[in-house]
């Protein structure tokens, strides 16, 4: 997988949402190809839409299916990709087979993301994708998110974070783009409920 140096610029906080969107699209255009981890939430859906718009068929959105992922979330993703014509695939992950995940400790999300990114790493290598990205935003850095550690370990990119995009800005830009996920509430996986 190609290494990519993330750009964090303090001036991004002075940019308008539209300027941050332009920065995001410029960053995405630098990739020869990209896999986007698409959960169906507002952030990952916006990232998938932006990557598809910039990269076309060079972008592939991928959703992991497992017992932790709800049928409702799957239906949301199916509708989203059908409506927007986003290139997409479902894959299976097996985090439930990991005793550390099943222990249900505070870092459970780490093991889920580690499984997801391991499967996506293999997919990227086998199919020649240059990078993997996920939909973490600038607000997510304020919370305890064990999945971020897995992303760092797997060198997964965070284009929304790199563009300085916050959740309200992503919702605004998603609404402007007509994305059906713009106002989708954040929800935990079935293992967290």
Ranges and model annotations:
Residues 2-176:
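ATP-dependent adenylation/nucleotidyltransferase module used to activate substrates
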Residues 166, 175-193:
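Histidine/lysine/aspartate-rich catalytic loop segments that bind and position anionic ligands
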């Amino acid at each position: 997988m190609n290494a990519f140096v993330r750009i964090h610029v303090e001036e991004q906080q002075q940019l308008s949402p539209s300027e941050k969107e332009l920065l995001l699209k410029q960053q995405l255009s630098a990739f020869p190809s990209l896999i986007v981890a698409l959960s169906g939430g507002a952030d990952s859906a916006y990232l998938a839409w932006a990557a598809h718009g910039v990269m076309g068929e060079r972008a592939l959105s991928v959703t992991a299916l497992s017992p932790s992922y709800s049928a409702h979330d799957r239906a949301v993703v199916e509708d989203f990709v059908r409506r927007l014509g986003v290139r997409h695939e479902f894959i299976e992950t097996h985090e439930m087979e990991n005793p550390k995940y099943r222990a249900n400790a505070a870092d459970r999300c780490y093991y889920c993301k580690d499984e997801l990114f391991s499967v996506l790493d293999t997919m990227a290598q086998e199919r020649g994708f240059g990078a993997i990205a996920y939909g973490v935003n600038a607000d997510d850095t304020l919370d305890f998110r064990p999945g971020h550690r897995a992303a760092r370990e797997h060198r997964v990119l965070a284009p929304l974070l790199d563009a300085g995009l916050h959740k309200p800005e992503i919702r605004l830009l998603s609404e402007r783009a007509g994305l059906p996920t713009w106002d989708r509430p954040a929800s935990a996986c079935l293992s967290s409920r």
